[in-house]
């Protein structure tokens, strides 16, 4: 390593975030920022990639990168195996946090709230538009469980392909969506000298309240 970690930094000077720019509803601002990210971010960055943090029954945190697959006025939707580690964690503690980071825009969004399963109909609707390989994978992979090796996984895939050789796979009961119902959404815009802009929205008594946080 030619540069020490202590010396690795960059200054953020692209933009600012003033209250005058921020709507009263955080979903409006998220849609604006997400549209900017879709137009601006380039591979390997995926605009809908986010870090999802969960907490297990023993209070230990876990995080991983997932893809956002749905957004409406209710909340933010992602899909997974309900029997996976994250599914078990959400069953034990149905609260989570998401973080989106768009480096080209020098922006970050943090979202916190309760998580609930979406309807079976909504899960099936998304499942049916996935590529065939992904639909088969939802049946084949015992997500988060220990397996002997890659060969075992490939064997499970072949068995699943044979099972559905004459029919289209349907959405398994152990697979589906979760929706995070936000209680807090923070918008972060990088600024020079680490004096970043942070606008925080809190859902209180059925209404969104906006406040500025110190960087």
UniProtKB/Swiss-Prot annotation:
GO MF entries: FMN binding; pyridoxamine phosphate oxidase activity
Offer one example of a GO biological process linked to this entry.
pyridoxine biosynthetic process
Q: Which cofactor does it need?
A: FMN
Q: Which UniProt keywords apply?
A: Flavoprotein, FMN, Oxidoreductase, Pyridoxine biosynthesis
The superkingdom of the source organism is Bacteria
Residues the entry annotates as binding substrate: 9-12, 69, 126, 130, 134, 194-196
- Report the SUPFAM superfamilies cross-referenced here: FMN-binding split barrel (SSF50475)
Q: Which reaction does it catalyse?
A: pyridoxamine 5'-phosphate + O2 + H2O = pyridoxal 5'-phosphate + H2O2 + NH4(+); pyridoxine 5'-phosphate + O2 = pyridoxal 5'-phosphate + H2O2
EC number(s) reported in the record: 1.4.3.5
For this protein, what does the record note about how its cofactor is bound?
A: Binds 1 FMN per subunit.
Q: Which residues bind FMN?
A: 64-69, 79-80, 86, 108, 143-144, 188, 198
The reply to whether Zinc figures as a keyword in the UniProt entry is no
InterPro entries reported for this sequence: Pyridox_Oxase, Pyridox_Oxase_CS, Pyridox_Oxase_N, Pyridoxamine_oxidase_dimer_C, Split_barrel_FMN-bd
Pathway where it operates: Cofactor metabolism; pyridoxal 5'-phosphate salvage; pyridoxal 5'-phosphate from pyridoxamine 5'-phosphate: step 1/1; Cofactor metabolism; pyridoxal 5'-phosphate salvage; pyridoxal 5'-phosphate from pyridoxine 5'-phosphate: step 1/1
Task: Please give the Pfam families that the UniProt record associates with this protein.
Answer: PNP_phzG_C, PNPOx_N
Q: Which HAMAP family match?
A: PdxH
User: Briefly, what is this protein's role?
Assistant: Catalyzes the oxidation of either pyridoxine 5'-phosphate (PNP) or pyridoxamine 5'-phosphate (PMP) into pyridoxal 5'-phosphate (PLP).
What family is this protein classified in?
Belongs to the pyridoxamine 5'-phosphate oxidase family.
Complexes and interactors: Homodimer.
Q: What is this protein called?
A: Pyridoxine/pyridoxamine 5'-phosphate oxidase
- Species of the source: Pseudomonas putida (strain GB-1)
* Underlying gene: pdxH
């Amino acid at each position: 390593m030619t540069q020490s970690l202590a010396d690795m930094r960059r200054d953020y000077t692209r933009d600012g975030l003033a209250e005058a720019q921020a709507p009263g509803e955080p979903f409006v601002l998220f849609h604006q920022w997400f549209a900017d990210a879709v137009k601006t971010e380039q591979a390997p960055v995926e605009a809908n990639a986010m870090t999802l943090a969960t907490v297990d029954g023993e209070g230990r945190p876990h995080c991983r990168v997932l893809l956002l697959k749905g957004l409406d006025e209710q909340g933010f939707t992602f899909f997974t195996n309900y029997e996976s580690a994250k599914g078990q964690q959400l069953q034990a503690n149905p609260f989570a946090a998401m973080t989106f980071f768009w480096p080209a825009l020098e922006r970050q969004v943090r979202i916190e709230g309760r998580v609930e399963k979406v309807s079976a109909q909504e899960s099936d609707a998304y499942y049916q538009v996935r590529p065939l390989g992904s639909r088969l994978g939802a049946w084949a992979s015992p997500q988060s469980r220990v397996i002997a090796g890659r060969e075992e996984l490939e064997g499970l895939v072949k068995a699943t392909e044979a099972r559905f050789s004459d029919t289209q796979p349907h959405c398994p009961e152990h697979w589906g969506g979760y929706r995070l119902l936000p209680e807090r959404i923070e918008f972060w815009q990088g600024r020079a000298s680490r004096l970043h802009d942070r606008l925080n929205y809190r859902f209180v008594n059925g209404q969104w309240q906006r406040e500025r946080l110190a960087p």
